[in-house]
């Protein structure tokens, strides 16, 4: 059985926040932010727009694109670090709101790697034969856990959601290989500070880790699929920082024109980052049926995940 993406949807909030916004209260500038991160703007959810609201919008699109009814979804997995509540989960809230039956629903926490982890979990459940259509959502409202007094991180984060329906696809398409991993010794470099409930990041250490692991994981995933860099049509890295992304691309040996870049529009949206990029490339006609995609992310934990897939239902 070949398992992959049967339906896709993405959602970004309406509010656009440009770099100049930060100039009034931080020692920074539009030019500096653009040069150091590649970010020009990001989207922030409104105060009354919760993580589950964004997940709902993306999910509706994914279910419609899959050509199924919501009632045909038999499991929900939501990758997020910013649930509406500690519990119930976003998946529970989403299940009720979508009108789906009493199916298995769970949130998965792997920070910015969460979408990769959740996709692979869904793949295994479908291949077991017990499930047919699993809704996987990557969503985060990072604006609510951003420390706006910290110049190094305040400028980075945005909000958004992406959703896919994972199920059986045509022969030769779908998820070809994957690589998942974690290193708990690096947990101290990126975490939610319990004192203020905001993100803390040791940028220097995270940068060194990300540059190395994104390249390694991508190369390993491609090799596991018995492919080479020349076979890759689109490289979709976690949109954390353009310099990290470029380093990973170079290590994989992918030409610049084959890398998806949406960090300039959305900033770092954690678990939503990769699906938002996929959505952008679909809109631009840069992803077509039977294209080989490499998706790779890293995040707090420290965690990482890479997936090689052949696009198409």
From Swiss-Prot:
It catalyses: malonyl-[ACP] + acetyl-CoA + H(+) = 3-oxobutanoyl-[ACP] + CO2 + CoA. InterPro entries: ACP_syn_III_C, ACP_syn_III_N, FabH, Thiolase-like. One of its GO terms (biological process) is fatty acid biosynthetic process. It is an enzyme of class 2 (transferase). The active site is at 112, 238, 268. Keywords: Acyltransferase, Cytoplasm, Fatty acid biosynthesis, Fatty acid metabolism, Lipid biosynthesis, Lipid metabolism, Multifunctional enzyme, Transferase. GO terms for molecular function: 3-oxoacyl-[acyl-carrier-protein] synthase activity; beta-ketoacyl-acyl-carrier-protein synthase III activity. Its EC number is 2.3.1.180. It is found in: Cytoplasm. Pathway: Lipid metabolism; fatty acid biosynthesis. Residues 239-243 are annotated as: ACP-binding. Pfam families: ACP_syn_III, ACP_syn_III_C. One of its GO terms (cellular component) is cytoplasm. Catalyzes the condensation reaction of fatty acid synthesis by the addition to an acyl acceptor of two carbons from malonyl-ACP. Catalyzes the first condensation reaction which initiates fatty acid synthesis and may therefore play a role in governing the total rate of fatty acid production. Possesses both acetoacetyl-ACP synthase and acetyl transacylase activities. Its substrate specificity determines the biosynthesis of branched-chain and/or straight-chain of fatty acids. The last Arg residue of the ACP-binding site is essential for the weak association between ACP/AcpP and FabH. Homodimer. Belongs to the thiolase-like superfamily. FabH family. This is Beta-ketoacyl-[acyl-carrier-protein] synthase III. It comes from Staphylococcus saprophyticus subsp. saprophyticus (strain ATCC 15305 / DSM 20229 / NCIMB 8711 / NCTC 7292 / S-41).
């Amino acid at each position: 059985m070949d398992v992959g993406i049967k339906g896709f949807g993405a959602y970004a909030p309406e509010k656009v926040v440009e770099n100049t916004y930060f100039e009034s209260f931080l020692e920074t500038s539009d030019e500096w932010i653009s040069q150091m991160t590649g970010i020009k703007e990001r989207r922030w959810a409104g105060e009354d727009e919760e993580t589950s609201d964004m997940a709902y919008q993306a999910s509706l699109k994914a279910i419609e694109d899959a050509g199924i009814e919501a009632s045909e979804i038999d499991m929900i997995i939501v990758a997020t670090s910013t649930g509406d509540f500690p519990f119930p989960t976003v998946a529970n809230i989403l299940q009720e709101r979508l009108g789906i039956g009493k199916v298995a629903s769970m949130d998965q926490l792997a920070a910015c790697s969460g979408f990769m982890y959740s996709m692979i979990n869904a793949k295994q459940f479908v291949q077991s034969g017990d499930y047919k259509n699993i809704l996987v959502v990557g969503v985060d409202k990072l604006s609510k856990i951003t420390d706006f007094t910290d110049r190094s991180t305040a400028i980075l984060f945005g909000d958004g959601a992406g959703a896919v329906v994972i199920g059986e696809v045509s022969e030769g398409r779908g998820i070809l290989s994957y690589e998942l991993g974690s290193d708990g010794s690096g947990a101290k470099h990126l975490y939610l500070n319990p004192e203020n409930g905001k993100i803390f990041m040791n940028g220097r250490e995270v940068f060194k880790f990300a540059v190395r692991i994104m390249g390694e994981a991508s190369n390993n995933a491609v090799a596991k699929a018995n492919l080479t860099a020349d076979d890759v049509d689109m490289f979709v890295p976690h949109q954390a920082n353009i310099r990290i992304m470029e380093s990973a691309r170079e290590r994989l040996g992918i030409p610049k024109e084959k890398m998806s870049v949406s960090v300039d529009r959305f900033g770092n949206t954690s678990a939503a980052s990769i699906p938002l990029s996929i959505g952008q490339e679909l809109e631009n006609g840069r992803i077509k049926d039977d294209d080989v995609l490499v998706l790779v992310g890293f995040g707090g934990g420290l965690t990482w995940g890479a997936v090689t897939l052949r696009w198409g239902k």
